[in-house]
Amino acid sequence: MNMVAFGKKVVKFRIPILIISILLLIPAGLGYVNTRVNYDVLTYLPEDIETMQGQDILVKDFGTGAFSMFIVDGMEDKEVSALKAKIENVEHVQKVLWYDSLADISMPKSMIPKDVYEVFNSDTGTMMAIFFDEGTSSDGTMEAIGKIRKLAGKQCFLSGMSAIVTDTKNLAEKETPLYVLIAVVLAVIVLGLTMDSYFIPLLFMLSIGMAIVYNLGSNYFFGEISYITKALAAVLQLGVTLDYSIFLMHSYEEQQVRYNGDKERAMAHAISQTFSSVIGSSVTTVAGFIALCFMTFTLGMDIGVVMVKGVILGVIACVTILPSMILCCDKWIMKTMHKPFLPDIGKISDKVTKRYMIYVILFLVLLFPAIYGNNHTAVYYNLDETLPKDLPSIIANEKLKKDYDMNTTHMILVDSSVESADVAKMIDKMDDVDGVKWALGLDALIGPAIPQDMIPNSVTDMLKNDKYQLLLVNSEYKVASDELNAQIKDLNKILHKYDKGGMLIGGGPLTADLIDITDTDFKTVSMVSIGIIFVIILILFKSISLPVILVGVIEFAIFVNMGIPYYTGTKLPFVASIIIGTIQLGSTVDYAILMTTRYKRERNHGAEKYDAITTAHRASAQSIMVSALSFFAATIGVGLYSNIDMISSLCILMARGAIISMIVVIFVLPSMFMVFDKVIVKTSKGFLPAK
């Protein structure tokens, strides 16, 4: 079936299409509500690395998944003991370790080994370690965190990664619905002003909104998605697929002129034209997201697969649901027609082609500072840096650092066959490592007043079994810092001297692995995405020179966007470079292909260089501006509103990227065509009229 015939079918069955699309929202909505969300990005690390295997051993052999430090200020020992007993009864709490776990609270604290006493006490209060029977980000652990907070008073503080994950979940659940609302409202306002009807943007949002619901609902079949994917997917899908809707509307208006007001015939041909044009554009966008799937850090796969699905559903909605809506609401569209609030494109086009050398010089002047900034922008890997400072977990972590000089806690799994004397030597050496506050094992709990046979079995079982013994090491250094990563290497050297199969695990080592893995991943994805786009442009335009020019211009736009934070001293979340690189690559290549296609057509029809480039610019600039400004509006609002820095930073980068890409494609790309026109026509097929 050719696409015109398909378009005629859509036009004929527009009412059934709308009914089916509305009915499909029911299962999609149910799927969306029942899709589990993962709030811990560390779980996306490869399962075969030592730190992840160690986490599994903790759960399997010790029944311990997550752990948190619980600070209690200004409470009598009896009250603390009673609170501890209540916490131990909370579902999914495996064990609580405190002073009374080792001895009766009537025993003077001076009789406890000094090392142990200093670990659990400060000038203002005391601290207990809470161990959970499930992982850091499991539903059970997060429910337990909520219950413990209800039991605790204002003078109690629950720290640790599980508390951070719980707060992230609570904040994201509150904010995510508003992200979509903000994006839609701002995009509708911009579209209403830049298009020639106030009603059309509402239809765009309805059809794209349906595709978004289908996409989010179908995530149910994946089992779970990350909170980053959930928060960004709707806004991203809106921004990425909006181009297709704009193209359909412009094509429909052109076809109405061609077919003298026969709207059904015009729409059938508009669907055909849109599908043909959108295929090239959507393939490049999909290719960018597929590149994310090459990451061993599987958050890339999570975002990539959801967005590939979103683009495909967006294309389907654009050639089925949107045309049906436009035909059914034609009267409303006509009643709300107006002149678009956009500058005179013709004047801009003439100036760009006449003054092209100015933009080429600006490109060359900005290129090297942009590359330098892009390569030196600082990033952070520590997840608590993405959250507001007034959240309970962040306050607790700061208190832990201030009162107990604790920043990071490592856990060490040592083979139980290693002699106690060797374990003691190992602990002594670890104590001497820079930044280690203390290292504790079962032997450290034993003192003159507490012989081993007096320690309850529940405590012994928690720290030692037939296969492994568990040690705790506290670090003064912050997660993801260079100092902590160096410390982890030193601790591993000592550990492997005494036990070659020993494992150092916890948030610090996991984050160190995250840094190493993502550094390699990002280079791979960047090369793969550029390679795929290069090949697509090569095939699309049958040209050797155009892939180099287009990819060069697109990468320049990305370098400018990602280089700005270096000069403003802004730190970005670690995923920013790869997510923004992929998204901006996808949107900019759409704009570039649109202008290049028209430039090729004009040259093929016999137009000279200047006229062909001016006409191509005039024909495509408005669509590029409408799309970019709408994407900017959708993302800037979310970026300014969100209290989760990971989401806020990504959205602000996307918003700025949309404007930079628009400027680069409107001013730099046609200037490059002016400079390299001779090379392009000689190295490309179909740019000159057939002889």
Task: Describe every region a protein language model picked out.
Residues 1-37, 136-381, 486, 496-691:
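Membrane-embedded transmembrane helical bundles of large multi-pass transporters/channels
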Residues 47-67, 72-162, 378-379, 384-546, ...:
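Structured non-transmembrane domains adjacent to transmembrane bundles in polytopic membrane proteins
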